[in-house]
């Protein structure tokens, strides 16, 4: 069994409706496998599942351009089916809760169908239009419900006054942050390689902030416990220090980051600074098939390429405990799953979704 202190056992267990009711260490294992709390998918876009293999990968600006064009061609029925297929894949692969970003209907219903809990955030992207006006804010406040709220997409895609308004709320919010070097350059200088995508021929340049994305969020008082920064690939040591002091968590999405040529996120340094780091599957449009084991393996591989290796135990703690902590959930309260046919965390890291047994 995987606890916060590490792997214990062998032993026998009783689980009722996914919840661990008894653990008897030393009685001899009743199954060949490892008992773990379900995974927490710290960052997700269920609605993009049917766009897998259709987007432009490599440069992130090109990816954003392609996904905007593809979204415009999707029918509401395709979006709903995409959400349902992705939710089903998450469930079958051992995920219990998701921090979901979505700007179209379907995610809440799909998660509910498969018993997935978590937080669904309706993304606000308003830079290309007018600021998130008072009437829209009233709608957002009226929509507020357990597990659902409106929230910002990213510092580069939202008006400052809108971001400041979200900062003032006490809502649990997640925001894409420092995903690429181009994003950091855009915010610190007002221009970057994204200009053609981000601004267009008739758009005014983004006001120069002379701040990194993390510094900007700090200046607006967005950073606080209950808030999550997604990606954090291009954060500096001073950014990490700010994050650690503020109480925010981070979502690490290594397969998506690799496919979009983003810098490798300094996960070990963030965790050493006290930042809880969960693992997110992001979207199938950028990361590929929904597979938590593949995501964990890439997290380990990328950390080694960076020269700041994470241990196998680190990866499992992030997947099973730290992502849940970021949502304010005690992972040990369940549900639990069995990874069948494995006897060590190293062996379990090589598992596939087909080896997940829901209890």
Residue ranges and their predicted role:
Residues 1-28, 325, 329:
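N-terminal metal-binding scaffold of metallo-dependent hydrolase/deaminase domains
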Residues 24-36, 170:
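Active-site metal-binding motif and surrounding structural segment of the metallo-beta-lactamase
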Residues 37-49, 172-181:
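Histidine-centered catalytic micro-motifs
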Residues 45, 103, 123-127, 153-155, ...:
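Active-site beta-loop-alpha junctions enriched in small/polar residues
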Residues 49-81, 119-122, 181-224, 299-307:
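Active-site gating loops and adjacent loop-to-helix segments of metal-dependent hydrolytic enzymes
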Residues 196, 219-222, 265-345, 351-359:
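His/Asp/Glu-enriched, well-ordered alpha-helical/loop segment
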């Amino acid at each position: 069994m995987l606890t916060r202190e590490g792997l214990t056992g062998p032993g026998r267990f009783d689980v009722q409706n996914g919840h661990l009711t008894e653990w008897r260490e030393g009685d001899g294992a009743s199954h060949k496998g490892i008992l773990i709390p379900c995974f927490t998918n710290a960052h997700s876009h269920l609605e993009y599942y049917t766009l897998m293999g259709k987007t432009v990968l490599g440069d992130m600006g090109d990816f954003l351009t392609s996904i905007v064009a593809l979204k415009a061609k999707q029918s509401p029925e395709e979006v709903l089916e995409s959400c349902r297929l992705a939710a089903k894949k998450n469930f079958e692969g051992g995920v219990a809760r998701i921090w979901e970003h979505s700007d179209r209907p379907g995610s809440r219903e799909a998660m509910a169908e498969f018993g997935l809990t978590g937080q669904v955030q309706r993304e606000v992207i308003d830079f290309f239009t007018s600021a998130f006006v008072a009437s829209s804010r009233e709608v957002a406040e009226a929509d507020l419900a357990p597990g659902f709220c409106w929230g910002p997409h990213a510092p580069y895609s939202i008006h400052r006054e809108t971001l400041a308004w979200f900062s003032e709320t006490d809502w649990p919010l997640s925001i894409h942050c420092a995903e690429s070097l181009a994003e950091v350059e855009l915010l610190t200088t007002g221009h970057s390689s994204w200009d053609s995508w981000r601004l267009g021929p008739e758009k005014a340049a983004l006001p120069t902030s002379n701040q990194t994305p993390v510094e900007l969020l700090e200046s607006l008082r967005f950073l606080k416990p209950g808030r999550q920064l997604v990606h954090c690939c291009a954060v500096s040591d001073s950014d990490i220090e700010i994050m650690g002091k503020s109480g925010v968590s981070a979502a690490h999405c290594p397969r998506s980051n690799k496919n979009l040529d983003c810098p490798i996120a300094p996960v070990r340094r963030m965790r050493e600074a006290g930042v809880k780091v969960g693992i997110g599957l992001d979207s199938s449009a950028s990361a590929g098939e929904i597979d938590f084991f593949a995501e964990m393996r890439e997290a380990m591989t990328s950390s080694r390429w960076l020269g700041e290796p994470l241990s196998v135990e680190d990866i499992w703690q992030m997947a099973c405990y730290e992502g849940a902590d970021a949502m304010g959930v005690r992972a040990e309260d369940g549900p639990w799953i069995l990874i069948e046919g494995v006897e060590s965390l190293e062996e379990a890291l090589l598992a596939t979704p087909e080896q997940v047994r829901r209890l």
